[in-house]
């Protein structure tokens, strides 16, 4: 399911954002050869015809996921991506990781959920006046614990279970996240620069992954496509805003346990 007019990205938008500038030629990954137009001043130039086609396919894909009330996890922990990842994922009502990827965020979801429950418990205590009844030292310790957990898990605390896809800015930087997703059979959408390895990425979007203007364009476009998908679903339902069905955590646990079980 998708909107009749899903979000589209145009060649001129990518050019203006500098999405065609790759890395220095000496740092290239040969697997990205098919997506490279040429080189200028020892900098690889990405063929944006490939980028436009791949990006719009990815936008149509996430648009359809959102229309079916599925979840797309936004991942971008480096400086150029973290701010816009948190902002746009929140705008689209999607989970995100913007601080640091903790090993096992997907493959060890059952255990990680305990930390999420602890975060929610501390947030409740902060709101209901429990902290005010503690000694200053105890209140400070709990506040610090809450802030630490919020930095690491705040973006996924309401995810409810494993995502249906992940969108990654800089696939090399987020290699652990991609590996976990692939182990669980979760589709990966990735911005892949000329120095990166496109292996294990289901939707390869060849583009610059460092320029803040370009990264902002990518992430905002993804969020727009998701919002459009949600709005289309509501229109199809007669304009009634249906509550999203929470993912069954039992199903998520079963999925992670199945992936962790070695084949006989």
Curated annotation (Swiss-Prot):
It comes from Psychrobacter arcticus (strain DSM 17307 / VKM B-2377 / 273-4). Belongs to the universal ribosomal protein uS2 family. Pfam families: Ribosomal_S2. Keywords: Ribonucleoprotein, Ribosomal protein. Gene3D superfamilies: Glucose-6-phosphate isomerase like protein, domain 1, Helix hairpin bin. The gene is rpsB. InterPro entries: Ribosomal_uS2, Ribosomal_uS2_bac/mit/plastid, Ribosomal_uS2_CS, Ribosomal_uS2_flav_dom_sf. The keyword Ribosomal protein applies. Residues 233-264 are annotated as: Disordered. One of its GO terms (biological process) is translation. CDD domains: RPS2. HAMAP family: Ribosomal_uS2_B. GO terms for molecular function: structural constituent of ribosome. GO terms for cellular component: cytosolic small ribosomal subunit. This is Small ribosomal subunit protein uS2. PANTHER family: 30S RIBOSOMAL PROTEIN S2 PROKARYOTIC AND ORGANELLAR, SMALL RIBOSOMAL SUBUNIT PROTEIN US2M.
